[in-house]
Amino acid sequence: RAVWLTTNYGLDWPRNRLSHEQQKKELISILDNLKKWNFNTVLFQVRARGEVLYDSKIEPMSSLIVGNPGSKEKFDPLAFVIEECHQRGLECHAWVVTYPLGGDKHVRSLGRSSVTKTNPNIVKKFGNEWYLDPGNPRTDDYLLSIVKEIVTNYDVDGIHFDYIRYPDNRGRFPDDDTFKKHGKGMKRDDWRRDNITRFVTKTYDWVKSEKPWVTVSSSPLGRYRALGRNGNGWTAYETVYQDAGKWMQLGKHDALFPMMYYKEHLFYPFVDDWIENGNNRILVPGLGPYQMIELGWSKQDIINQVDYVRKKPIHGQAYFRADNLLSNTKEIMNSLSEYYQFPAKLPALTWLSDEKPTEAIDLRAEKQDDGIFTLKWDEPKESNGNRVTYNVYRSEDEELDINDGQNLIA
């Protein structure tokens, strides 16, 4: 049960005119509501178009943070949101927009700190927008340095890649020189797909070598490949060179959140196609409640999709974006609350280890001065210094069913 919490342009958070203290209160309110509605995963946008929302030595802090009135104190949004998420039992995944860098005006606003100035050899201008060049191996190194900075310095639960693809206008990206230098005799379409797969592989291998519990995921286009008459025109594989199914088959992704912001014949067959290509790893369709505003979808359009995916071997739902849910557009949350009455367990990364979870040691109830009992326990010895999380269950019966969501309280 995930949401994309969008910081680009302050769409979900933060509002540019607020002080840091007000921004913190606003973010806490969002997280409190997600917890109240029994969500468990926040995809928090930490990088968008060459600027970031954490303390970085590589890229500049977002102007939405540094440009606020009364902002003399140092504020690290990623550190703050991780702490607040974990206090509420929410996972926090660092959402990283990969290749797009923005238009001329945005790039100029970053001055000499823009990657177009610090690393001009790995960028391309396409139309009115700047992009990192996926075909240049040094682009991999640059993006991986950002991932390393985040994973090393922050207790994130996941790294989540967005726009991990070529721009939409197929074949026109100006990479002739890069292809000539690095193409290795491949067809250009295959070479472009291989470029992104190469970066995915490098990143996954590094993350798992450092913090194997950190989930590596991405949000590819919602239609993997053209299926007969369905989905022609804009697909991940054919149009923007995302071979996301291959990433799963190679074991270089833990999860996919395909952006399935379509209806009917452009939705249902593609859910099944993702299942076929998911390699039994975590698959979480991204649903688009924002379409109720932009395209006039009914609430029932979203609910029908939730019904469908919950009957499939799928591991949850994600929603774009937070405000479209929490503002209760067309009373969507009233309906979703019937599905999310109780907390839900997160799927385990069973391909990393098939060991069963260990029990807490020396579980005890201690009575406090106010008469309240506090549960306490010791960390399992098997943790070996790794971060440990717990599920807490409660039942009034002697037999406790851990598969019954009503018994999961924290």
Regions found by a protein language model. Name each.
Residues L5-T7, V214-G233, F270-Q305:
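Active-site clefts of carbohydrate-active enzymes
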Residues T6, G10-K25, E83, H93-N153, ...:
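Active-site-adjacent "subsite" loops/lids of carbohydrate-active enzymes
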Residues G10-E21, P60-F75, F126-L144, G185-I196, ...:
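The substrate-binding groove and active-site-proximal loops of carbohydrate-active enzymes
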Residues W37-E73:
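Aromatic-lined carbohydrate-binding/catalytic grooves of carbohydrate-active enzymes
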Residues F39-N40, R47, A79, R88, ...:
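Polysaccharide-binding and catalytic clefts of secreted carbohydrate-active enzymes
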Residues A244-F267, R281-S353:
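Substrate-binding cleft of secreted/luminal carbohydrate-active enzymes
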Residues E331-N386:
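Pro/Thr/Ser/Gly-rich low-complexity, intrinsically disordered linker/stalk tracts
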Residues R387-A410:
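Recognizes extended acidic, P/S/T-rich segments that occur
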